[in-house]
Amino acid sequence: MCPGNWLWASMTFMARFSRSSSRSPVRTRGTLEEMPTVQHPFLNVFELERLLYTGKTACNHADEVWPGLYLGDQDMANNRRELRRLGITHVLNASHSRWRGTPEAYEGLGIRYLGVEAHDSPAFDMSIHFQTAADFIHRALSQPGGKILVHCAVGVSRSATLVLAYLMLYHHLTLVEAIKKVKDHRGIIPNRGFLRQLLALDRRLRQGLEA
């Protein structure tokens, strides 16, 4: 199991931090199913965090959050036997570095690899990778029998952010809809910087539809 206790502790800490912040969060009510969908219009970061704290918080080493699309952690990425069992054909590593992740790691499995060298920091610009990552995921799922693992160290922030961007770019989901779709299957908690970047993408896509 991936560290579900860690995820819950992180969510609890962030919730307390939000409440104690000098900038008061906007209060929302209701369950995950009652949260707004298309007509949000544009939630702020605190409202998104409230949505993230609601509903499923547990996770496995990998969870199928969209048909053929698995969101997971480094342990799953290193488990060749499990990758073969799941039929994974592509791996997108959102925590790529000289020490973590290479195409050679999947030699003999027929897996195509894309590494994104991203830092799980609110100051890191993940948005520059949104389109490239979404295109890679789309190509993987477009081929017959294609299945992709999108992962980072824990599978809740960097990789989750790229999966949300993919759902928004290729399936025209709003950010709220994308979060709800993923959280039906796995707890996630992108950092605040990533949430702001996803909000900017959401605004751009919504404004493009309205133009």
Curated annotation (Swiss-Prot):
Catalytic-site annotation from UniProt: C152
Tyrosine-protein phosphatase domain segment(s): 60-207
Catalytic activity entry: O-phospho-L-tyrosyl-[protein] + H2O = L-tyrosyl-[protein] + phosphate; O-phospho-L-seryl-[protein] + H2O = L-seryl-[protein] + phosphate; O-phospho-L-threonyl-[protein] + H2O = L-threonyl-[protein] + phosphate
PROSITE patterns reported in the protein's UniProt record: TYR_PHOSPHATASE_1 (PS00383), TYR_PHOSPHATASE_2 (PS50056), TYR_PHOSPHATASE_DUAL (PS50054)
Record bears the keyword RNA-binding: no
Enzyme class: hydrolase
Main location: cytoplasm
Superkingdom of origin organism: Eukaryota
Family annotation (Pfam families): DSPc (PF00782)
A single MF term (Gene Ontology): protein serine/threonine phosphatase activity
EC numbers for this chain: 3.1.3.16, 3.1.3.48
Protease found in the keyword field: no
Coiled-coil stretches: none
Any Gene Ontology biological process: positive regulation of cell adhesion
Tissue expression notes: Brain. In the brain it is expressed ubiquitously except in the hippocampus. Expressed in embryonal cancers (retinoblastoma, neuroepithilioma and neuroblastoma) and in anaplatic thyroid cancer.
Keyword terms, alphabetized: Cytoplasm, Golgi apparatus, Hydrolase, Nucleus, Protein phosphatase
Subcellular location(s) per record: Cytoplasm; Nucleus; Golgi apparatus
GO CC list: cytoplasm; extracellular exosome; Golgi apparatus; nucleoplasm; nucleus
Oligomeric and partner information: Interacts with HSF4.
UniProt record similarity statement: Belongs to the protein-tyrosine phosphatase family. Non-receptor class dual specificity subfamily.
Role, per record: Inactivates MAPK1 and MAPK3 which leads to dephosphorylation of heat shock factor protein 4 and a reduction in its DNA-binding activity. Inhibits MAP kinase p38 by dephosphorylating it and inhibits p38-mediated apoptosis in anaplastic thyroid cancer cells. Can also induce activation of MAP kinase p38 and c-Jun N-terminal kinase (JNK).
Name under which the protein is recorded: Dual specificity protein phosphatase 26
Taxonomic classification: Eukaryota, Metazoa, Chordata, Craniata, Vertebrata
